[in-house]
Swiss-Prot record:
Cofactor(s), names only, from the UniProt record: Mg(2+)
GO molecular function term, any single one: ATP binding
Record-listed Mg(2+) binding positions: T16, D32
Main location: cytoplasm
Organism: Salmonella typhimurium (strain LT2 / SGSC1412 / ATCC 700720)
Pathway it works in: Metabolic intermediate biosynthesis; chorismate biosynthesis; chorismate from D-erythrose 4-phosphate and phosphoenolpyruvate: step 5/7
Cofactor: binding comment: Binds 1 Mg(2+) ion per subunit.
Keywords associated with the record: Amino-acid biosynthesis, Aromatic amino acid biosynthesis, ATP-binding, Cytoplasm, Kinase, Magnesium, Metal-binding, Nucleotide-binding, Transferase
Localisation: Cytoplasm
BP-aspect Gene Ontology terms: amino acid biosynthetic process; aromatic amino acid family biosynthetic process; chorismate biosynthetic process
Protein name: Shikimate kinase 2
Binding site for ATP: G12, C13, G14, K15, T16, T17, R120
Signal sequence coordinates: none
Catalytic activity, EC: 2.7.1.71
Gene: aroL
Organism lineage: Bacteria, Pseudomonadati, Pseudomonadota, Gammaproteobacteria, Enterobacterales
């Protein structure tokens, strides 16, 4: 059994897409803190924030993080999970943290292309490109401080997964044939 792999980064960096592909490539389970939370409270993130505020959402997010953390699991986290110091320390201590790093332009393009974009509550109330820039400026140092590895997430998902696997200690990789899975 291996430590969980936590994917952190801003909205649109590919945590869920890369996470599912990485789980398949490593034979790990996959979990998404936002999806777990939404399925357990039967509300969208926007509804939770509207009813409980960001503080209530962040408390629930910590509970979700702890609930999905298990050996041999790839965990896609919410973009703001690193705002809570406990979460940063927990992920860094319990698992391997991978920051999926991408520039504002890439993040905005991906977010604009997402069909569920309207389900995500605005963080600042500003236009998307301005919001993404501000949020990334506020959080980038926290992502970097928390991460064991920083990976360029602008590439194709398969290439990002290959780079993550190459960066991980050999004991995390399972080689089957000529493909890391």
């Amino acid at each position: 059994m291996m430590q969980p792999l936590y994917l952190v980064g801003p909205r649109g960096c590919g945590k869920t897409t890369i996470g599912m592909a990485l789980a398949q490539a490593t034979g790990f389970r996959f979990a998404d803190t936002d999806r777990w939370l939404q399925s357990h409270v039967q509300m969208s993130v926007a509804d939770i924030v509207e009813k409980e505020g960001w503080g209530g959402f962040r408390a629930r997010e910590t509970a979700a993080l702890e609930a999905v953390s298990a050996p041999s699991t790839v965990v896609a986290t919410g973009g703001g999970i690193i705002l809570t110091e406990y979460n940063r320390r927990y992920m860094h201590r319990v698992g391997v943290v991978i920051y999926l790093c991408a520039p504002v332009s890439t993040l905005v393009n991906r977010l604009e292309a997402e069909p569920e974009a309207d389900l995500r509550p605005t963080l600042t109330g500003k236009p998307l490109s301005e919001e993404v820039r501000e949020v990334l400026e506020q959080r980038d140092a926290l992502y970097r401080e928390t991460a064991h590895y920083i990976i360029d997430a602008t590439k194709a998902p398969a290439q990002v997964v290959s780079e993550i696997i190459a960066a991980l200690p050999p004991s995390t990789q399972r080689l089957q044939g000529d493909v890391y899975t």
